């Protein structure tokens, strides 16, 4: 893995841009550190002084209350100063370029920049312009590495392992940065990944991914330890990718009857936000096998771990 993407180390350029850049040791280090951070969240005083005096900037060019808030809580629990920078109403909306914004962040002395952008590759460009660490919080349809890390963390907490698990990812794989990040991370950690989607929502280059492809959800569910449902991203679509929402739900939605096909131990996951009644039924989303609420809580622990490791937090976390 290149030094510019390393989660661990002592170099100046330490970024988390893609799960494809993480080796097994890197990924396990994040998950193990997140486990310790989760214990902090369960303590009476849920704060550590490890990043006191550091500045974390949340630079969001796309709306995402859930992810931005998760990073903000994570940074504040580590005692970092947090600046929330929204593109709406800012200099960016008046024509300021990403490079201009990077120079502004440099002048502010940002130690870490958490970047979400509609353009794939934007965080990578930003990482070449700033001296602080850059965390990719989602770039276009490319990647969302901390979502994949929190998903893996959730699987390991519930099932005790990731190695050897059969994970099925269902839905709009074509437009899903969550799917891409999960595929690379889970393969690195030893899981077998199958994607299930309409042919129109399967990426052209998927033959180079470490996955199996199926178009038959019913055939795959009985063999799945984890099924991850993806939201259909209408905002990223410019053409008709499936006939109707009803047809999509009938073939690729996880309703109560389909959930019965899963093994007793199997988990149902969703990165959120959910479209209830389309890709997942409310009864399934709210069932005991669903991890949707846990994923939100685990997201804070994982993002604490990432910031702690990237910024070389002071002191041990017990």
UniProtKB/Swiss-Prot annotation:
Domain of life: Bacteria
Matches recorded under SUPFAM superfamilies: Aspartate/ornithine carbamoyltransferase
Entry keyword set: Pyrimidine biosynthesis, Transferase
InterPro entries in alphabetical order: Asp/Orn_carbamoyltranf_P-bd, Asp/Orn_carbamoylTrfase, Asp/Orn_carbamoylTrfase_sf, Asp_carbamoyltransf, Asp_carbamoyltransf_Asp/Orn-bd
Keyword set includes Transferase: yes
GO CC terms of this entry: cytosol
UniProt-recorded Gene Ontology molecular function terms: amino acid binding; aspartate carbamoyltransferase activity
GO annotation terms (biological process): 'de novo' pyrimidine nucleobase biosynthetic process; 'de novo' UMP biosynthetic process; amino acid metabolic process
Root EC class: transferase
Binding-site positions, L-aspartate: 94, 177, 231
Enzyme Commission number(s) of this protein: 2.1.3.2
Pathway(s): Pyrimidine metabolism; UMP biosynthesis via de novo pathway; (S)-dihydroorotate from bicarbonate: step 2/3
Residues binding carbamoyl phosphate: 66-67, 116, 144, 147, 272-273
Catalytic reaction annotation: carbamoyl phosphate + L-aspartate = N-carbamoyl-L-aspartate + phosphate + H(+)
Assembly behavior: Heterododecamer (2C3:3R2) of six catalytic PyrB chains organized as two trimers (C3), and six regulatory PyrI chains organized as three dimers (R2).
Function according to Swiss-Prot or TrEMBL: Catalyzes the condensation of carbamoyl phosphate and aspartate to form carbamoyl aspartate and inorganic phosphate, the committed step in the de novo pyrimidine nucleotide biosynthesis pathway.
Family (UniProt): Belongs to the aspartate/ornithine carbamoyltransferase superfamily. ATCase family.
Name of this protein: Aspartate carbamoyltransferase catalytic subunit
Species assigned in the record: Frankia casuarinae (strain DSM 45818 / CECT 9043 / HFP020203 / CcI3)
């Amino acid at each position: 893995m290149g030094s510019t993407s390393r989660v661990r180390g002592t170099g100046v350029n330490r970024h988390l841009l893609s799960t494809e850049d993480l080796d097994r040791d890197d990924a396990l280090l994040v998950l193990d550190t997140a486990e310790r951070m989760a214990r902090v969240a369960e303590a009476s005083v849920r704060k550590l002084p490890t990043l006191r005096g550091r500045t974390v900037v949340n630079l969001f060019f796309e709306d995402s209350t859930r992810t931005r808030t998760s990073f903000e809580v994570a940074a504040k629990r580590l005692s970092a100063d947090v600046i929330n920078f929204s593109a709406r109403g800012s200099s960016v909306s008046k024509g300021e370029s990403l490079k201009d914004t990077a120079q502004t962040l440099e002048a502010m002395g940002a130690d870490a920049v958490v970047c979400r952008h509609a353009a794939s590759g934007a965080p990578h460009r930003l990482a070449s312009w700033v001296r602080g660490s850059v965390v990719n919080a989602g770039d276009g349809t490319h990647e969302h590495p901390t979502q994949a890390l929190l998903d893996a963390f959730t699987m390991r907490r519930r099932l005790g392992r990731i190695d050897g698990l059969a994970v099925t990812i269902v839905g709009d794989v074509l437009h899903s940065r969550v799917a891409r990040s999960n595929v690379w991370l889970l393969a690195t950690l030893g899981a077998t990944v199958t994607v299930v989607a309409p042919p129109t929502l399967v990426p052209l280059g998927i033959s180079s991914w470490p996955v199996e492809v199926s178009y038959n959800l019913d055939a795959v569910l009985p063999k799945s330890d984890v099924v991850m449902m993806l939201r259909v991203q209408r905002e990223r679509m410019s053409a008709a990718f499936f006939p109707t929402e009803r047809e999509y739900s009938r073939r690729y939605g996880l309703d109560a009857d389909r959930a019965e096909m899963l093994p007793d131990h199997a988990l149902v996951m969703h990165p959120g936000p959910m479209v209830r009644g389309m890709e997942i039924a409310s009864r399934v989303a709210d069932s005991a096998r669903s991890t949707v609420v846990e994923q939100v809580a685990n997201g804070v622990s994982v993002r604490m771990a990432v910031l702690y490791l990237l910024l070389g937090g002071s002191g041990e976390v017990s």
